[in-house]
UniProtKB/Swiss-Prot annotation:
Function according to Swiss-Prot or TrEMBL: Egg-yolk protein that is a source of nutrients during embryonic development.
Biological classification of the source: Eukaryota, Metazoa, Ecdysozoa, Arthropoda, Chelicerata
UniProt-recorded name of the protein: Lipovitellin-1
Top-rank taxon: Eukaryota
Length: 14
């Protein structure tokens, strides 16, 4: 879902 992608993106940006 988009929420899952959003979470993954935030992890990658850390």
């Amino acid at each position: 879902s988009l929420e899952d992608i959003e979470h993954e993106v935030e992890e990658l940006l850390r």
